Design a protein with these regions (language model features):
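Bacterial N-terminal signal peptides
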Residues: 9-19
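Exported/extracytosolic protein signature
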Residues: 2-3, 7, 22-148
């Protein structure tokens, strides 16, 4: 093989390898905390660690993420416990699933049979963290649910 052919082969190999390296999956560490929202006279709403829950309690989930490596965007998916129904997230960019994570969409655009989906139908919730936000290195996703 000539030097020119070796150089051309190496250049082609690097050209194809570069996008693969750039598209390496994001390495993300997640940490979750669960709080219950309490209304306290003269203090308003307080979040307390959720040690005991009862029907009707508003639960606030805080998912903290830290970028450990990789590039690009990533997705955070959380299944909802059967004992709660979804209320919404702080940023409104979430997608929900009604079928255990097989299909996704905005709650206001999904249907169950011939009716619009309701928060009680949600089984999973996910957020797509775009590359520009992921590049900051860390962040939080906050959403709430009501205990059934």
């Amino acid at each position: 093989m000539t030097i020119r052919r070796i150089a051309a082969t190496l250049a082609c190999t690097l050209a194809f390898a570069a996008p693969i390296m750039a598209a390496a999956p994001a390495l993300v560490a997640l940490d979750s905390a669960v709080y219950v929202e309490r209304i306290v006279p003269n203090k308003g709403r307080l979040l307390q660690p959720a040690s005991a829950l009862k029907r009707g309690d508003r639960v606030v989930y805080v998912v903290s993420w830290t970028r450990m490596g990789g590039q690009g965007s990533f997705t955070v998916t959380n299944p909802l416990p059967k004992k709660v129904y979804y209320q919404g997230s702080a940023d409104g960019r979430e997608e929900v699933s009604l079928d255990g994570g097989r299909s996704w969409g905005r709650l206001d655009a999904l249907r169950v049979g011939d009716r619009l989906a309701t928060p009680e139908d949600v089984t999973h919730v996910r957020w797509r963290v775009p590359a520009n936000e992921a590049g900051r290195g860390s962040g939080q996703i906050i959403y709430s649910a009501i205990v059934r």
